């Protein structure tokens, strides 16, 4: 995924696009980066645990430069992180997307460590295709484990940002190999709001799916689908208003006016958390909801991380941030997310980080 609409000009042969959030820098007093490893905001302790990727960390897998990192718990108990456009050893070399890494880390507070990759010693592209005119790149939006299979939802670009369709790929071996399910979500459907997805399984045995436009230019809509129909788009039931009342089966109605970028919808017991990158406001927000159908306007937002400039970073203010993927093993009281950062001026930072949030269970979510 590309923060602020930047394209990879050298790779795609297109002109660089302007940033979304240059004028949206977060306000407030910034602490020096070295002043503290954590900060408390409204009773929530925010900590940067570590860099998860980078040449000296994941270069041994051929993943020197990666972003995103949506993640699921595999059937065998490991976590599988799925990354977007990936390069190595040098920037722009050996372009692959999506790629993956496994982690057996159980104590997230100690920091996630990776111990393997689909492909053996060198990370392979999970979906077989050539980066070219027909398909420039395929970007992952989320993964989910249902029974003994993993389902990967990904966005197919014909020129970055020109989404021709999104699809679902399936793995029956913990992410080592993947098969195209044949599911196709048209890029223009629902005013492009069926492109980028996040999902989780409810206690009622429905998978709830938030979707929005890939280029962070739309609000989100909601569908639900039975797990056994997850690869059949025609079985997805939209949530919308009919005669002024919300119901399943109506044309999908946007849930709020917020612009939803990369996001993560996850259930914790009887509650749901939704984390997302808000491009226009240049920050990562979250909400705790009673159910995915809850009107987001009835719940308060918590800003997890603010955007800022490169010379004003501190614990919870990051330059050119994006992503926001909940890491399995988290709890509402101790939430960990994967966050991306890309310095588009020189590519010196293009990596994924782990952030920890303690106390979201005690936060007052009432609007």
Please provide the spans of the model-predicted regions.
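Generic low-polarity alpha-helical segments
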Residues: 8-12, 105, 222, 265, ...
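Beta-rich carbohydrate-recognition and catalytic domains
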Residues: 36-64, 73-134, 145-190, 203-260, ...
């Amino acid at each position: 995924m590309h923060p602020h609409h930047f394209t990879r000009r050298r790779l795609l042969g297109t002109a660089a696009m302007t940033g979304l959030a240059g004028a949206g820098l977060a306000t407030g007093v910034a602490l020096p980066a070295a002043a503290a490893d954590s900060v408390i905001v409204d009773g929530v302790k925010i900590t940067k645990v570590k860099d998860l990727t980078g040449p000296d960390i994941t270069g041994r897998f051929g993943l020197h430069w990666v972003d995103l990192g949506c993640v699921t718990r595999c059937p065998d108990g490991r976590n599988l992180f799925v990354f977007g456009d990936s390069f190595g050893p040098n920037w722009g070399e050996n372009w692959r997307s999506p790629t993956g890494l496994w982690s057996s880390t159980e104590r997230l507070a100690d920091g996630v460590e990776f111990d393997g990759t689909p492909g053996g010693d060198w990370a392979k592209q999970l979906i077989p295709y050539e980066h070219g005119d027909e398909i420039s790149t395929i970007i992952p939006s989320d993964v989910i484990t249902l029974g003994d299979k993993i389902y990967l939802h990904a966005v197919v670009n014909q020129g970055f940002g020109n989404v021709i369709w999104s699809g679902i790929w399936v793995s029956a071996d913990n992410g080592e190999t993947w098969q195209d399910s044949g599911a196709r979500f048209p890029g223009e459907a629902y005013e492009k709001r069926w492109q980028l997805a996040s999902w989780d399984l409810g206690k009622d045995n429905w998978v709830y799916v938030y979707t929005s436009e890939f280029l962070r230019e739309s609000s989100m809509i909601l569908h639900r689908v039975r797990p056994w129909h997850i690869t059949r788009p025609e079985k997805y039931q939209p949530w919308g208003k009919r005669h002024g009342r919300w119901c399943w089966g109506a044309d999908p109605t946007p849930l709020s006016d917020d612009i939803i970028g990369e996001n993560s919808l996850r259930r914790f017991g009887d509650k749901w958390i939704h984390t997302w990158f808000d491009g226009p406001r240049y920050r990562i927000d979250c909400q705790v909801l009673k159910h995915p159908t809850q009107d987001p306007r009835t719940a308060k937002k918590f800003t997890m991380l603010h955007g800022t400039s490169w010379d004003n970073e501190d614990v919870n203010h990051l330059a050119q941030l994006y992503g926001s993927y909940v890491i399995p093993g988290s709890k509402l009281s101790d939430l960990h997310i994967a966050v991306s950062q890309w310095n588009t001026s020189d590519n010196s930072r293009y990596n994924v980080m782990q952030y920890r949030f303690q106390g979201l269970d005690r936060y007052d979510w009432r609007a």
